[in-house]
Curated annotation (Swiss-Prot):
Primary location recorded for the protein, binned into one broad class: cytoplasm
Keywords associated with the record: Cytoplasm, Schiff base, Thiamine biosynthesis, Transferase
HAMAP family on file: ThiG
UniProt superkingdom: Bacteria
Name of the molecule in the record: Thiazole synthase
Keyword Cytoplasm: yes
UniProt pathway: Cofactor biosynthesis; thiamine diphosphate biosynthesis
Species this protein is from: Acaryochloris marina (strain MBIC 11017)
CDD domains: ThiG (cd04728)
GO MF terms, alphabetically ordered: thiazole synthase activity
E.C. designation(s): 2.8.1.10
Length: 275
């Protein structure tokens, strides 16, 4: 990925702090939906991401397409984010989270306590259960997990999850895998403005411009899987998503000009040539 001259103020971008870890990249990626492991590995590398999420249940059960998945990634280079995808209740999510922590340890990340919390009883729209998510989050925080909960763009729920000790909040941009982009910008903006933990826009981002849009709003990071894995050229799309995420963050930090209802000339009026 293209680097920025260290003399530029943009190079002072602060690191992303989640739990006890710091990260340079603000793009998180996934491991699902790739045609093969080699494409997945190359895409992860091209994206420049440092956090990669893995569905614990699918790895544990050797679901089709997931056999050998955990071993296919070089976990010395990226941080594993186990997730509870497929869990329909809080109790199930807590059990799977514990398995995820053990899986991370077995793969060499002894101090990895991260868990992406997903409680999704709805198999059609894949919308997260707010009550089950809150219940599971409270228990997992008590057990020492750094909880990254996947939620609807609900500012009140986001604040409550922050209050119980979650390490981030992860509001969806639009339904998982839909590629619809950011459909609830107003609520996500409220979440960003009121959060004291990182806000990660997760799900629905379909293009680099949408990744940049999320970052320009002030999101701390984005998580993108389907848009990369199912692109015609996943490796190239991963590169584009990494660049867009970085560009969006720089744009947010640099401060865009205000929107005006009238024109403002770029050139001074003084010294005009008149007839």
């Amino acid at each position: 990925m293209q680097t920025i001259d260290s003399s530029s103020s943009a190079a002072t971008t602060e690191t992303l702090q989640i739990g006890h870890r710091q990260f340079q990249s603000r793009l998180m990626t996934g491991t699902g939906k790739y045609d093969d492991f080699e494409t997945m590995r190359r895409s992860i590398a091209a994206s420049g991401c440092e956090i990669v999420t893995v569905a614990v249940r699918r790895v544990q059960t050797n679901a089709p397409g997931h056999q050998g998945l955990a071993e296919a990634v070089d976990w010395n280079k990226v941080w594993m984010l186990p997730n509870t995808a497929g869990c329909q209740t809080a109790e199930e999510a807590v059990r799977v989270a514990r398995l995820g922590r053990e899986m991370a340890k077995l793969l060499g990340q002894e101090d990895n306590n991260f868990i992406k919390l997903e409680v999704i009883p709805d198999s059609k729209y894949l919308l997260p259960d707010p009550i089950g998510t809150l219940e599971a989050a409270e228990q997992l925080v008590k057990e020492g997990f750094a909880v990254l909960p996947y939620i609807n763009a609900d500012p009140l729920l986001a604040k409550r999850l922050e209050e119980v000790g979650c390490a981030t909040v992860m509001p969806l941009g639009s339904p998982i895998g839909s590629g619809q982009g950011i459909k609830n910008m107003a609520n996500i903006q409220i979440i960003i403005e009121n959060a004291t933990v990182p806000v990660v826009v997760d799900a629905g981002i379909g293009s680099p411009s949408e990744a940049a849009q999320a970052m320009e709003m002030g999101a701390d990071a984005v998580l993108i899987n389907t848009a990369i894995a199912k692109a015609q050229d996943p490796v190239m799309m991963a590169t584009a998503m990494g660049m867009a995420t970085q560009a969006g963050r720089f744009a947010y930090q640099s401060g865009r000009i205000p929107v005006k209802a009238y024109a403002s000339a770029s050139s001074p009026l003084a010294g005009r040539i008149s007839s």
